[in-house]
């Protein structure tokens, strides 16, 4: 810490699980600032040990009320005349250090200083230092402070004089695509929740227009086209982040998932009994689940009376999923060594004893015609020359965006147990049919895809990561241009070919989310193959 006589400078940070970043950022400031104040919000890594090894004062507040209030609380611990607000992933360069030291020789009055920040993503610089880099108000007299915003917080300037410092902060935004996407989705949700709490209603035109403007601004106006492939990746990711913000806000106002759920419960309660006395084949219902207490009962209500056994393989539920399953006579098994959806379905099937397997997820429900069609199959001896598919109708945020008369997924879900099983794929697993044809059954399988848009987007990120790692393990590669065109095609397929355009605003949101998912997984795969290259 600095001991020279001058006005005191306090560095103020808020952190959570930032140990890796603190190892880089603290050495750049520890020997010349007067104090380092760090306010933690619940870290489980060794960040405190690292911080204290550099003389930082560590405080904790887990009552999170947003970034703005957390910065206010952190600043309250500071004793300096000047405040330098930093994030753990920001590194002060030597030129910036010298600029700061010159400023704090002067008494703190009414001047707030902006600091230009160069962003890095996955270790690559994505801002061009010669292209009008934006300054952030980070060095200021202690009498100033941050606003109350949950996200996108900033210093309240009032009538302050503003100046910009020479030198740069190096901002290491994310070490991996997965980290960036998860972090920005958290920001998008917090932003949407904050606006919704203020009475703001999401407008659909902003879901369409604002992401387009975000790309133009990030890639062209901010000069990231000068930074090659990583400048493009960042601009595409930021466009997706902007879409997520406005789409999540729209969903908070217009979501119909709870209505669709209650309708599915009522449907399950009003199904007619099925005569199963003429069955010649037995049927095992096979399910994999985790924390499905909300959906499982309604699912089992539509199927329990036509099957001979119910097999449930759980992967670590902490709710009352087991009690619900066992109330329907289910045989409960557990495997928490998760190896992907395909392997988990194989393990679940291994517990079954019926002639046929019917595979369902907890958020799916059989309608009356499909119940009857399955029972009709069981009236014959087990058939091994074909598998049976069901037409699945998806409700997205409670809306059936793809009209069933236009498009429905055809999924092989009913098959001879000893002759077929699911593939090993971690995500997007499917039945190995070994060249045997499928016969589509009458009726529909209703699928309650998600409770809200954020839940859907979060799953998409996880599935993208699983898909990319699986392909990388099998020595698959791709190019960025191929990933871009695949993403565009996925939008066309969803919006036009599958009829999302008939689903109104949510049809567009689903098509855009699908495009984002495709883009993410190919960028992740490309990055895995190129991360060690300059």
Give short role names for the model-derived ranges.
Residues 32, 54-55, 158, 306, ...:
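Short, structured coil segments at secondary-structure junctions
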Residues 48-77, 308, 322-351:
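Conserved donor nucleotide-binding strand/loop of the catalytic core
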Residues 68-75, 82, 93-258, 263-276, ...:
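Catalytic-site signature of metal-activated, phosphate-bearing donor transferases
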Residues 28, 40-49, 87, 302, ...:
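A conserved acidic beta->alpha catalytic loop
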């Amino acid at each position: 810490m600095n001991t020279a006589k001058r006005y005191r400078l306090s560095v103020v940070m808020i952190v959570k699980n930032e140990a890796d970043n603190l190892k880089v950022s603290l050495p750049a400031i520890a020997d010349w600032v007067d104090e380092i104040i760090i306010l933690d919000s619940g870290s489980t890594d060794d960040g405190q040990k690292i911080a204290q090894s550099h003389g930082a004062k560590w405080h904790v507040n887990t009552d999170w009320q947003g970034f703005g209030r957390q910065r206010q609380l952190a600043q309250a611990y500071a004793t300096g005349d000047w405040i330098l607000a930093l994030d753990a992933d920001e590194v002060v360069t030597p030129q910036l250090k010298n600029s700061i030291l010159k400023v704090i020789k002067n008494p703190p009055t009414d001047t707030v200083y902006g600091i230009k920040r160069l962003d890095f993503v996955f270790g690559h610089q994505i801002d061009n230092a010669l292209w009008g880099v934006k300054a952030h108000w980070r060095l200021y007299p202690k009498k100033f402070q941050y606003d109350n915003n949950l996200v996108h917080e900033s210093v309240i300037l009032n009538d302050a004089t503003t100046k910009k410092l020479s030198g740069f902060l190096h901002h290491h935004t994310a070490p991996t695509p997965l980290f960036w996407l998860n972090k920005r989705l958290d920001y998008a949700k917090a932003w949407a929740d904050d606006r919704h709490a203020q009475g703001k209603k999401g407008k659909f035109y902003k879901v369409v227009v604002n992401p387009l403007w975000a790309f133009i601004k990030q890639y062209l106006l901010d000069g990231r086209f000068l930074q090659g492939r990583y400048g493009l990746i960042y601009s595409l990711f930021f466009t997706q982040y902007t879409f997520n913000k406005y789409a999540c806000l729209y969903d908070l106002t217009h979501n119909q998932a709870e209505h669709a759920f209650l309708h599915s419960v009522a449907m399950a309660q009003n199904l007619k009994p099925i005569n199963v006395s003429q069955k010649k084949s037995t049927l095992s219902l096979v399910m994999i689940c985790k924390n499905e207490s909300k959906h499982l009962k309604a699912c089992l209500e539509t199927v329990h009376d036509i099957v001979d056994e119910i097999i449930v393989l759980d992967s670590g539920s902490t709710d009352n999923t087991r009690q619900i399953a066992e109330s329907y006579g289910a045989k409960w098994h557990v495997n928490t060594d998760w190896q992907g959806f395909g392997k988990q379905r194989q393990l679940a099937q291994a517990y079954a004893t019926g002639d046929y397997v019917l595979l369902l997820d907890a958020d799916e429900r059989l309608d009356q015609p499909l119940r009857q069609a399955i029972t009709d199959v069981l009236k014959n001896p087990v058939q091994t020359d074909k598998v049976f598919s069901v037409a699945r109708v998806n409700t997205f945020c409670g809306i059936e965006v793809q009209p069933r008369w236009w498009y429905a997924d055809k999924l092989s879900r009913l098959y001879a147990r000893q002759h077929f099983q699911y593939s090993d794929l971690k995500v997007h697993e499917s039945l190995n049919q070994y060249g045997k044809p499928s016969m589509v059954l009458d009726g529909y399988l209703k699928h309650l895809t998600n409770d809200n848009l954020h839940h859907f987007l979060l799953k998409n990120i996880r599935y993208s990561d699983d898909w990319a790692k699986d392909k990388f393990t099998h020595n698959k590669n791709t190019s960025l241009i191929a990933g871009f065109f695949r993403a565009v095609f996925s939008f066309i397929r969803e919006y036009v070919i599958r009829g999302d355009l008939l689903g109104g605003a949510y049809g567009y949101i689903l098509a855009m989310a699908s495009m984002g998912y495709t883009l993410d997984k190919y960028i992740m795969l490309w990055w895995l193959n190129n991360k060690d290259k300059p």
